[in-house]
Amino acid sequence: MQAYFDQLDRVRYEGSKSSNPLAFRHYNPDELVLGKRMEEHLRFAACYWHTFCWNGADMFGVGAFNRPWQQPGEALALAKRKADVAFEFFHKLHVPFYCFHDVDVSPEGASLKEYINNFAQMVDVLAGKQEESGVKLLWGTANCFTNPRYGAGAATNPDPEVFSWAATQVVTAMEATHKLGGENYVLWGGREGYETLLNTDLRQEREQLGRFMQMVVEHKHKIGFQGTLLIEPKPQEPTKHQYDYDAATVYGFLKQFGLEKEIKLNIEANHATLAGHSFHHEIATAIALGLFGSVDANRGDAQLGWDTDQFPNSVEENALVMYEILKAGGFTTGGLNFDAKVRRQSTDKYDLFYGHIGAMDTMALALKIAARMIEDGELDKRIAQRYSGWNSELGQQILKGQMSLADLAKYAQEHNLSPVHQSGRQEQLENLVNHYLFDK
């Protein structure tokens, strides 16, 4: 079959002096960073949905792209053609992983039976493509938000029959992920929320969602899936308010239903923006709560109130993100999935490469800067100094539960405590970070 991207062999590393827009300037898969190959640190993945499913349509306009697999035709044949192009793209881009929703890779069909049969055929196709290319599945998931049946949610739907249909999709998608050797399974509650409280029973919907997640965990263990289950927080869009608002909110939900040891988080940069947080904040929070799993690497627009899903291009922002990830030991089953799309005006097929190449170079340079920060150790040293009082006898007694509130009040009076505020030195630390970013 003729190559779709016939003007490109493979994207290669040419170094920072290169002016070739179809070459990496910073991402060298084999370069050692802190003793490990860059490819193993970053674990890049390209997503199926934005890259091969979106046709350029938006709220105000029809599809703008001319993709051969999006033309009228037999649905399964078009899905197979899309898979051909997708794996050509993954290979030429040098990404070791990819991600998908069930209906990204397979026609949904007109019934559950058709859905299951179509998906089974496409899983066999994907398995063959993975074996040929060496590209692996980072994670799979089920799209339980696009079809009109999910207008009021999937797990939180007022109709238990819709809940059951969603369960069928998740069972099928998780088993497909398991068969394909996927390293994670993601749950994103696109419509698990509400438009108005006038027709919403918050307690009922929360209980439904909690039970659904418990069943997901049960099924994972039943089929022997060894990957990580991941929830992807998002505050709103398409609903007014979603129940997986941010990392801290999801932690409370998981604790309520006894799932905090079973499910981790897939943090998306643009979702952090929508929640009023920095990407850095959401990553650091997930790590602090013991829930960090994987990343959807993209960016939003602080001046817009919706998910723009642009490619990451801020080394400054992502250096601090990679610093947190490296401090936490790096990825295990997770990775950096580019949940990002070219702009509607970017109609040339090679724009798909430009977007991903820039994003991969951004994250590679961010990784190298973060590694310098780790090796230097100055930021960690400053934080350790700031909290050093908690290593004292008093601090340890408080943390170990050896002193009550009344004990502390007595201690403060007996020792005539008069603590003096110590400077947080924020400006100095910001200058230090700029040193890592901009000084060679």
UniProtKB/Swiss-Prot annotation:
EC number(s) per entry: 5.3.1.5
Superkingdom of origin: Bacteria
GO molecular function: magnesium ion binding; xylose isomerase activity
Root EC class: isomerase
One GO CC term on file: cytoplasm
Cofactor stoichiometry and binding remark: Binds 2 magnesium ions per subunit.
Binding site for Mg(2+) 2: E268, H271, D307, D309
Cofactor(s) needed by this chain: Mg(2+)
Catalysed transformations (reactions): alpha-D-xylose = alpha-D-xylulofuranose
Subcellular location: Cytoplasm
GO BP of this protein: D-xylose metabolic process
Coiled-coil features, chain-numbered ranges: none
Active site feature: H101, D104
Keywords in alphabetical order: Carbohydrate metabolism, Cytoplasm, Isomerase, Magnesium, Metal-binding, Xylose metabolism
Binding-site residues, Mg(2+) 1: E232, E268, D296, D339
Homology family: Belongs to the xylose isomerase family.
Oligomeric and partner information: Homotetramer.
Protein name, as recorded: Xylose isomerase
